[in-house]
Amino acid sequence: MFISRRCRIKGFTLKNLLWFRSSSTRFVSTESPDASAITKPDGIFNYSLLENRTYIRIRGPDTVKFLNGLVTSKLLPHFIKKNLTTVEENEVPTEEGTTKVDPIIPVPEFDARLGNWGLYNEKGIQGPYISRFGLYSAFLNGKGKLITDTIIYPTPVTVSEQISNYPEYLLELHGNVVDKILHVLQTHKLANKIKFEKIDHSSLKTWDVEVQFPNLPKDIENPWFDNLLDPMALPKNSIDANNFAVNVLNSLFNSDPRILGIYVERRTESMSRHYSTFPQSFRVVTSEQVDDLSKLFNFNVFDFPFQVNKKASVQVREIRFQKGLIDSTEDYISETLLPLELNFDFFPNTISTNKGCYVGQELTARTYATGILRKRLVPVKLDNYQLLDTDPERKYAEFHIDNVVEKSLAENEPTLNPFTNKPPERTKRKQRPAGLLISNEGLYGVALLRTEHFSAAFSSDEPVEFYITTTKGENIKITPQKPFWFSDWKNNNGPHK
């Protein structure tokens, strides 16, 4: 194997991206491996064609300013006139879970109205950076509720100076919410110099990709940091960002022009830092001509064989729920949840706390500042999940801390009625639910769990049991799984916030 102590793939810089090569590289077909095989393949490539994805193309000189006022991410830097050699301190997580201090180097001032320059990201290894890869963000309504999450792709992945005079992006949305977002864009357009259009769903394809190296030693750093995640967060201008994207596109996809957008998953970075074998996920947007993404992937750039698996979209959803992540309004009801309840504050550059005004900002900023948040999304496992299929209340089903239905009703103190001679009666009140099941795919799902139950669910030697009671009186056991951000939450908030 090619693995060194730090598993560094040589030659990976902004100017020259060269993955470790070998003339003996082998390719493993999509056929299932022999069950009797003792060793795992050195590389695993899982991919899936996602359904019901629709895109809005938006472009024009005011595009960045316009989107910056609508989404939760900071897309437009607030420039402060100062010496660009001035640096500030920036704490970033390390593999050991501690922090190191890196200098903050600001992005030099530029005209965001001109050129297809990419996306501004507020926080990176050395402060803000410019990227040509997608950004996970969200649209909120005026009350701060989530209309939909979205991925904003600079498109195409790479550009030459003469291609476009203005910024251009693709907004990835589920088909059931695209018309609502078109209405939001139209309502706020006013005099902004932008153009946007819904792209026919048959014109583009959306692929989920997961690349894993299962045989890596446990005591080394996950190679995706040295080779992709860290260097992609370094460019301070559009030229370096484009050069890096050119190298990545060439190395992984042989510069195939049918690749129109790439999103590098960063929401699970903390898991990647703790586990060297944790897979790196991507979202890839292609033209409709692509029938099999694995045929575009450049396996020859790696020095080991790969097992290639085409997954069904439901399998991708199961894996996503195991990580405690939602993805599009397929997983939740629009305008019913707060972004912080969905842990968007734990995702890099998904929510900005200092960008200023945007739709839904007031409640989001106040909640973040006070730290008072009573529920958060966690992964869960369900027993007898089949019972949910026939339950009309399966969306956002309440679950309680006890499996006995009668115990969900607590008795109030007896109340004396002054207008009757009858003795005082005890009334029953419904116990507050411990949480809500947001969505599931078979055994796995995601649920809002009240933070007051976190200690019992994740830190107790004898975890409590939670149950959903269906309309037929049947019980479904629901077991919360410790989320990847739990340690950070516990350190910052304590067990009862």
Swiss-Prot record:
PANTHER family in the cross-refs: TRANSFERASE CAF17, MITOCHONDRIAL-RELATED
GO cellular component, one term: mitochondrion
Molecular function as annotated in GO: transferase activity
Protein name: Iron-sulfur cluster assembly factor IBA57, mitochondrial
Coiled-coil annotated residue ranges, if any: none
UniProt keyword list: Mitochondrion, Transit peptide
GO BP, sorted A to Z: iron-sulfur cluster assembly; protein maturation
Family: Belongs to the GcvT family. CAF17/IBA57 subfamily.
Residues annotated as transmembrane: none
Organelle transit peptide: 1-27
Protein role: Required for lysine and glutamate prototrophy and mitochondrial genome maintenance. Has a role in the maturation of mitochondrial aconitase-type and radical-SAM Fe/S proteins biotin synthase and lipoic acid synthase.
Induction line: Up-regulated during calcium shortage.
Localization terms from the record: Mitochondrion matrix
Alphabetized Pfam families for the sequence: Beta-barrel_CAF17_C
Quaternary assembly: Interacts with CCR4, ISA1 and ISA2.
Annotated spans, Disordered: 414-433
InterPro entries attached to this UniProt entry: TrmE/GcvT_dom1, YgfZ/GcvT, YgfZ/GcvT_CS
Extra information: Present with 2960 molecules/cell in log phase SD medium.
Broad class of the protein's primary localization: mitochondrion
